[in-house]
């Protein structure tokens, strides 16, 4: 399987700022460490047309699509149905998924209402993913070399399903890419002055990426956390790239700014 991934997040609450999109950040980190290149994080409202459009574009441009949100029983939970529309197929009740949903509710004395049955609807041929924390199953769908995964929006549910079922699959099929990172903390040098140094370090190898994150005041008390990461075909090679970039970064900062710069690594 190729390594381009998109993350889709569904929910009005994300777009109005009521909820911070921690799911996307968590998934992006997971996918990156698995060797996938996350090229887009897209947030859409609980509107069918928007979800359909996002799905179609993602499936067309990515190898792996991970979506969170909109799998529950409420009227605005329509992600699974919109996914079917994006594929041009009729949503069907998956027998295995229905057993999962029924078991969750009937064990607590709740009836299996149409709203709850909706959580078991998915495209023909899709695989339901057990939810050990909540009630809505995840959905895994493969076609034409593409892998699409739909997960609940509740973080604990999303994380549990991903780690139990999705991560092992992606790890087994993912590109042979390893990831390494390091942080260098620099005090006393403004970000604008560090920028040329970072550009020079990044010229060492196209697999190395360096990004500065200011934490202090640019003029009065500059404080930078500089994140260095690299990907390579082996763990040792990735670590060597990061080590070389880190050493060169520190060397250049000391050369240019001397005692003015206070440097530490983490």
From Swiss-Prot:
This is Protein PAE0875. Transmembrane segments: none annotated. It comes from the Archaea. Belongs to the CinA family. PANTHER family: NICOTINAMIDE-NUCLEOTIDE AMIDOHYDROLASE PNCC, NMN AMIDOHYDROLASE-LIKE PROTEIN YFAY. NCBIfam families: molyb_syn (TIGR00177), PRK01215.1 (NF002291). Gene3D superfamilies: MoaB/Mog-like domain. CDD domains: cinA.
């Amino acid at each position: 399987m190729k390594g381009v991934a998109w993350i889709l997040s569904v929910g009005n609450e994300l777009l109005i700022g009521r909820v911070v999109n921690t799911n996307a950040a968590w998934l992006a980190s997971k996918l990156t460490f698995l060797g996938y290149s996350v090229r887009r994080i897209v947030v859409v409202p609980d509107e069918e047309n928007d979800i359909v459009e996002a799905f179609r574009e993602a499936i067309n441009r990515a190898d792996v699509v991970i979506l969170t949100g909109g799998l529950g029983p409420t009227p605005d939970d329509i992600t699974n149905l919109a996914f079917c529309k994006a594929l041009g197929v009729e949503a069907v009740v998956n027998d295995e998924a229905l057993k999962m949903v029924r078991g969750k509710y009937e064990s607590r004395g709740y009836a299996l209402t149409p709203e709850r049955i909706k959580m078991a609807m998915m495209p023909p041929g899709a695989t339901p993913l057990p939810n050990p924390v909540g009630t809505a199953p995840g959905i895994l769908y493969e076609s034409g070399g593409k892998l699409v995964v739909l997960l609940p929006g509740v973080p604990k549910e999303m994380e549990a399903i991903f780690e139990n079922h999705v991560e092992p699959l992606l790890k087994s099929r993912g590109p042979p890419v390893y990831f390494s990172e390091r942080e260098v903390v620099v005090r006393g040098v403004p970000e604008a002055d560090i920028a040329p140094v970072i550009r020079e370090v990044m010229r060492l190898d196209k697999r190395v990426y360096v990004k500065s994150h200011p934490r202090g005041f640019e003029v009065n008390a500059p404080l930078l956390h500089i994140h260095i990461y690299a990907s390579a075909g082996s763990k040792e090679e990735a670590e060597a790239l990061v080590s070389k970039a880190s050493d060169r970064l520190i060397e250049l900062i000391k050369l240019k700014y001397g005692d003015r710069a206070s440097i530490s690594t983490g």
